[in-house]
């Protein structure tokens, strides 16, 4: 702000020109897909989102086959349902590490991030639903002198 400001109106116009918020743009690869990684516990998911018919593939299998439990299928679909984009995107995910619950959470996190990269306007909806936040809870390590992380060995008075 090297120029001098003489009135409040000039201050307002200078503030508007300098503080123009950067417009969110799509982050797409050469094939027109949005890519994101999601993490949960020990699982890491790599997710690609592209326009399509709503087909979700996890590790080259349909997600209903890979995640057989209905609860895990629901977890996977939460960001799509919350953003009202059911049937509009094809999703391909590869996930490794952890168990099925952690993998479902990792794919959900990756889908949420990829949707915001493809359609930045969805960020507020997904952020409000808590889908963009990395769940940082991991298993607590076992301590020596204990049976598990916190459980002590059985104690006998006599």
Curated annotation (Swiss-Prot):
InterPro entries: Ribosomal_Su5_D2-typ_SF (IPR020568), Ribosomal_uS9 (IPR000754), Ribosomal_uS9_bac/plastid (IPR023035), Ribosomal_uS9_CS (IPR020574), Ribsml_uS5_D2-typ_fold_subgr (IPR014721)
Gene3D superfamilies associated with the record: 3.30.230.10
Keyword terms: Ribonucleoprotein, Ribosomal protein
An annotated GO BP: translation
CC annotations in GO: cytosolic small ribosomal subunit
GO molecular function terms attached to this record: RNA binding; structural constituent of ribosome
Family: Belongs to the universal ribosomal protein uS9 family.
Name of the protein this chain belongs to: Small ribosomal subunit protein uS9
Organism in which the protein naturally occurs: Brucella melitensis biotype 1 (strain ATCC 23456 / CCUG 17765 / NCTC 10094 / 16M)
Gene: rpsI
């Amino acid at each position: 702000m090297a120029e001098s400001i003489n009135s409040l109106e000039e201050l307002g116009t200078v503030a508007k020109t300098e503080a123009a918020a950067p417009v969110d743009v799509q982050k797409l690869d050469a094939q027109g897909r949005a890519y994101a990684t999601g993490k949960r516990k020990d699982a890491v998911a790599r997710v690609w989102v592209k326009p399509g018919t709503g087909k979700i593939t996890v590790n080259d299998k349909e997600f209903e086959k890979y995640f057989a439990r209905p609860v895990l299928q629901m977890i996977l679909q939460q960001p799509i349902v919350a953003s009202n984009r059911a049937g509009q995107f094809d999703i391909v995910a590869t996930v490794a590490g952890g168990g099925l619950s952690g993998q479902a959470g990792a794919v959900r996190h990756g889908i949420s991030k990829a949707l915001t990269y493809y359609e930045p306007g969805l960020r507020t909806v997904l952020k409000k639903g808590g889908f963009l936040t990395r769940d940082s809870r991991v298993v607590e390590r076992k301590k020596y002198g204990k049976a598990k992380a916190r459980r002590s060995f059985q104690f006998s008075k006599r």
